Structures are given as C-alpha cells and as structure tokens.
C-alpha cells in the first residue's frame, strides 16, 4: 500500500489513519426553551468540551487543538487552547493557550482547575467572575514531578480529591 504525504499536512497520514478524533464534528449548541434562543457553544473544529458534573451550570470549557495539530507528532502530549464559554450568551474567553493537561471542574461547578506545565503551577478559575488565581504558590512544595527529565514541561502530581462540597481541593505534592 502506498501512502502519499505532504510536508505541510496538518495531521500526518499515519495519525489520520488511526485516530478518528480529528474528523470534523458537528458544532455543539444549547437551546434555551424559555427564550427560544439557540447558542453556539463549540464550533465543529473544537473537539473537546469539559462540563461540570453537577446538574445545573452556566459555563463550560472548550479545548481547541487546531493550532497544535502539526506539532502533535513532534511533541509529547496533545496541547490545546482552553476557552471559558457562557451557555447563556455563547461568549468565549481564552483562559490559557497551549496547555497539555486537561481542565478539572469542581463537583459543584463553581471552579475549574488548570495545571500550567511551563509555570509549574495550578490555577483556579472562577467562571462567574473570570478571576484566575495561582493556588499552588502558597503550598510551599512542588506540585509537579521533580524527577521529570524530558525536554517538555513537567506534569503535575495530580488532584487527590475535593472537600467541603467542592469548595476545597487537595493536590498531591
């Protein structure tokens, strides 16, 4: 079997063959029954939607891997730009570009945690206010893999769990 490759393929032929994730998906919408309004949450090229596990919420995080697809074969890990999206208006705000670890919602949907590998820090986002806070600075111990010796940012040790109904988080150090 002959495969023809182009030097500027967004996705390498071998990856196209084995990964269905890069296929274009349908855009994602929210329909508000009361106002009869349809809101675009994620365009078709944004493949990852992260939502809280609680029953009612007004925001989601979407990940856009498009800018980093050409780099996937050259970097260890898939990077994405992460946006906060209002389900009421569809407004989209860039929270972090070029992150490799996925966001984690608190169980109550009040907070989203992001690990920033280049800064070796955990950040808490409060979706309603848009406030972004470095929560690992006060810990006093590394929250990243100290024995990491690869030419990429160190991974986090991870999240141990949530307490106080999702208002407090326990991080591994």
How would you label these PLM feature ranges?
Residues 1-173:
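Beta-propeller folds
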């Amino acid at each position: 079997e002959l495969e023809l490759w182009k030097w500027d393929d967004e996705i390498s032929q071998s990856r196209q063959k084995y990964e269905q994730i890069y296929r274009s998906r349908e855009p994602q919408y929210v329909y508000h029954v009361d106002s009869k309004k349809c809101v675009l949450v994620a365009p078709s090229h944004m493949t990852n939607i992260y939502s809280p596990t609680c029953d009612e919420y007004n925001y989601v995080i979407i990940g856009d891997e498009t800018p980093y697809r050409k780099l996937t074969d050259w970097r260890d890990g898939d990077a994405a730009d992460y946006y906060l999206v209002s389900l009421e208006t569809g407004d989209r705000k860039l929270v972090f570009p070029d992150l490799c670890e996925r966001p984690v919602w608190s169980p109550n949907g009040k907070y989203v945690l992001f690990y920033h590998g280049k800064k070796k820090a955990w950040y808490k986002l409060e979706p309603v206010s848009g406030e972004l806070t470095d929560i690992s600075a006060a810990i006093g111990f590394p929250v990243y893999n100290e024995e990491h010796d690869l030419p990429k940012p160190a991974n986090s040790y991870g999240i141990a769990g949530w307490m106080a109904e999702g208002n407090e988080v326990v991080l591994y150090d």
